[in-house]
Every structure is written in structure tokens, then in C-alpha cells.
């Protein structure tokens, strides 16, 4: 499936991208190359290949889930401009 110039213009509009007239041919070619690579990968026969999440059978050593630091909330909130009941107060952004 090859993209046309109009397809790239529509995609750019939907993505809120400003592409100049000079950028459109190069962007169209780049996107078509990417789609061509995806087509090549989809054409590979992977039947009989076991799906895997990690190529190595390795496990990570995890530390115990225990509190290792003391609570510093009060010290951190002393420099905050506004605090109420242990929560930081911030200006309203969305009405």
C-alpha cells in the first residue's frame, strides 16, 4: 500500500503537523519506505517460531519490598508555597 501526496497531507493535518510544500515529497517517500519495510516483515513466515517476550532466560534479583527511608514529607513541605493537610496546593489550570 503506497501513500499518495493527499494521504500524507491528511495525516499531517490530523497530527497537527505543518509540512511545507518542499517537505511533502520527502515525507511521502519516507513513509512509503517505512510501510514497505513493514510489508517485508509481515511477509516473513514465522510459523513454528515460538513467541517470546525476552530472548534470554534470565531473572533479575529483586530487593525485598521494605521501607528503607524515613518520612521526609514535613521537611519537604516547609518550603512549599501552599500546603493543606499534607497535600501540595497548586493554582487551578483548567476551568
Curated annotation (Swiss-Prot):
Entry annotated with the keyword Membrane: no
Gene Ontology molecular function: any one: glutaminyl-tRNA synthase (glutamine-hydrolyzing) activity
Assigned EC number: 6.3.5.-
Gene Ontology BP annotations: glutaminyl-tRNAGln biosynthesis via transamidation; regulation of translational fidelity; translation
Keywords: ATP-binding, Ligase, Nucleotide-binding, Protein biosynthesis
Catalytic activity: L-glutamyl-tRNA(Gln) + L-glutamine + ATP + H2O = L-glutaminyl-tRNA(Gln) + L-glutamate + ADP + phosphate + H(+); L-aspartyl-tRNA(Asn) + L-glutamine + ATP + H2O = L-asparaginyl-tRNA(Asn) + L-glutamate + ADP + phosphate + 2 H(+)
Subunit (UniProt): Heterotrimer of A, B and C subunits.
Function in brief: Allows the formation of correctly charged Asn-tRNA(Asn) or Gln-tRNA(Gln) through the transamidation of misacylated Asp-tRNA(Asn) or Glu-tRNA(Gln) in organisms which lack either or both of asparaginyl-tRNA or glutaminyl-tRNA synthetases. The reaction takes place in the presence of glutamine and ATP through an activated phospho-Asp-tRNA(Asn) or phospho-Glu-tRNA(Gln).
Name assigned to this protein: Aspartyl/glutamyl-tRNA(Asn/Gln) amidotransferase subunit C
Disulfide bonding pattern of the chain: none
Name of the encoding gene: gatC
Entry similarity comment: Belongs to the GatC family.
Any one Pfam family match given in the protein's UniProt record, by short name: GatC
Amino acid at each position: 500500500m503506497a501513500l499518495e501526496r493527499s494521504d500524507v497531507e491528511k495525516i499531517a493535518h490530523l497530527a497537527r503537523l505543518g509540512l511545507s510544500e518542499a517537505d511533502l515529497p520527502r515525507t511521502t517517500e519516507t513513509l512509503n519506505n517505512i510501510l514497505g519495510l513493514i510489508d517485508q516483515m509481515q511477509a516473513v513466515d514465522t510459523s513454528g517460531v515460538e513467541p517470546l517476550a525476552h530472548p534470554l532466560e534470565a531473572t533479575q534479583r529483586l530487593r525485598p519490598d521494605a521501607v528503607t527511608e524515613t518520612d521526609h514529607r514535613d521537611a519537604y513541605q516547609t518550603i512549599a508555597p501552599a500546603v493543606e493537610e499534607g497535600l501540595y496546593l497548586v493554582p487551578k489550570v483548567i476551568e
